Amino acid sequence: MTQVESRFAGGGAEAGARLRTLADLVSDGGVLVLSGAGLSTESGIPDYRGETGRRRRAEPMTYQTFTGSAAARRRYWARSHLGWRHIAAARPNDGHRAVAELARRGLVTGIITQNVDGLQQAAGADGVVELHGALDRVVCLVCGDRTPRARLDERLRAANPGWDARAAAPGTVNPDGDAVLADADVEAFRVVDCERCGGVLKPDVIFFGENVPPGRVRDCFALTEAAGALLVLGSSLTVLSGYRFVRHAAGHGVQVAIVNRGATRGDEHARVTLDAPLGATLRALLAELDARG
């Protein structure tokens, strides 16, 4: 086992060979990264499905439910208000930092993230395409005004004095920023409206059942076609939103590499797959590239 392989959590000859194949692809440059929730798990933000591909939790909020029910919006904002501090406190991990370093070296020339946590940008990466939006922004569904989530947090605290202390009992906040609340706490929560027009506010993210803006999708397809390779990090590719870019890459002769915990929907299109921890794998990738000079 080489020195680089010994630092790779996957270890062993097969893992080392897969790592070297990954390094071959990345060293040629022009790499487009497509990242999913698995890249942020080491920052304390659980992914949706885990290694088995099965959803960990109950069905998330849908766009149709959110827009069609004031009660659903109150429940969403109460839980999200309590849990937002967890997302806001998360910090980039080794995987995020490795992607940013590959970009600084000019090997990664584009990043599409399915994540809404902003951690890849916090690690220093520029020009990240936020496929599903970002939790640190809020948008009005009537006038389209966008404001920082921190401003909404201030307004919700002012509208609900003492509510945080009453609701935030130990153990009520899940690691993903969602919060387990009693019905009475939800009923007591007051939602605020757009400061500009009084319209309904929504996090600036793509809910399940909501379409990604067509222009954003076109930009991602263009990035995929121009790439020398597509590197998928931490995504099971179960939903079409991300999988379509893998399929598009394969259809245009762009080589695909996938690093994820567990199998993915796109494995059949990949030149190489690694079922291994993201942080350790990407650290080992950097070490392999450094060893090559």
Which residues are covered by each model-predicted region?
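Conserved catalytic core of sirtuin-type NAD+-dependent deacylases
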Residues: 1-293
